Design a protein with these regions (language model features):
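Acidic/His- and Gly-rich active-site-bordering loop/insert found
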Residues: 2-108, 117-133
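Small-residue-enriched segments and motifs
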Residues: 56, 244-246
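Histidine/acidic-residue-rich, glycine-tolerant segments that coordinate divalent metal ions
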Residues: 67-68, 89-91, 96-107, 113-114, ...
Length: 246
């Protein structure tokens, strides 16, 4: 513990415990009403309700149900972006929880309801310390994380300019909950921490022929099968065991 800790952090743990019931309530509200993709009207409404009494400048997305909120500190300084995703997955919940999904075919199975509630509570805690903040905080509530390019939509609508010409974020932070870690712990490391899902598209061109003369045809199936095997082997033979790869 530093000899003279930043006063903005004084009592922060106790304050977080104080807002925990509110965080849990918002998370369960979102969990009951999960929404898919870019259009999340109920989710956005819940977020706006939670932010309504805070000293924030709020921007609503037009092409998607995004929310961007800006918290200005009392002194000039850099802009920090905090991001939380909001969309659910196309699954039917069968947990039996009293706050289980009420929407058939939609479930918060990846924790985005928790991420959204945590970000809203972070906005509240930071707002309580506004007079101690240097710079500003940009709060990014993102729809469409599960393959719908929600961040791209938000950037095209001016996310990075939401805090003004001098408010371009100098750093950005996000997190992801994990059921494999003890509750209350945080895991991080320098460099890459989580895998990114990239898309590789390959077209194999064949040539038809007669079944009696396969040697005159070009069968794409064996070639494609060999490529699948080679791509699987690439991770173990072309990437160091010390590097994160799946």
């Amino acid at each position: 513990m530093p000899a003279n800790p930043n006063p903005a952090f004084a009592g922060l743990t106790a304050a977080a415990h104080a807002v925990q019931p509110r965080t849990v309530a918002l998370r369960r509200r979102l969990h009951r009403h999960p929404e898919l993709g870019l259009q999340l009207p109920m989710t956005r409404s819940a977020v706006l309700d939670e932010l309504a009494d805070l000293p924030l400048t709020v921007h609503r997305g037009e092409s998607c149900s995004s929310v961007v909120a800006v918290l200005d500190g009392e002194r000039p300084g850099p802009t920090v972006l905090l991001r939380g995703d909001m969309d659910a997955l196309p699954l039917t919940e069968q947990t039996g929880l009293r706050y289980a999904s009420k929407i058939e075919g939609s479930m918060h199975a990846c924790g985005h309801d928790t991420h959204t509630a945590m970000l809203a509570s972070a906005a509240r805690l930071l707002s309580q310390r506004r007079e101690l903040l240097t710079g500003r905080v940009l709060l990014m509530f993102q729809p469409g994380e599960e393959g719908d390019h929600g961040a791209r939509h938000m950037i095209s609508e001016g996310l990075l300019d939401a805090a003004g010409p001098a408010g371009t974020p100098s750093s950005a932070y996000a997190l992801h909950i994990s059921a494999t870690m003890p509750s209350g712990s945080i895991q991080t490391r320098p460099g890459a921490l989580m895998a990114a899902a990239d898309v590789l598209r390959v077209t194999v061109h064949g040539r038809g022929g007669h079944a009696s003369a396969p040697h005159d045809a070009l069968d794409p199936v064996p070639a494609a099968a060999a490529m699948v095997g080679a791509l699987q082997t690439m991770v173990t033979r072309r990437v160091s065991a010390q590097e994160p790869a799946v």
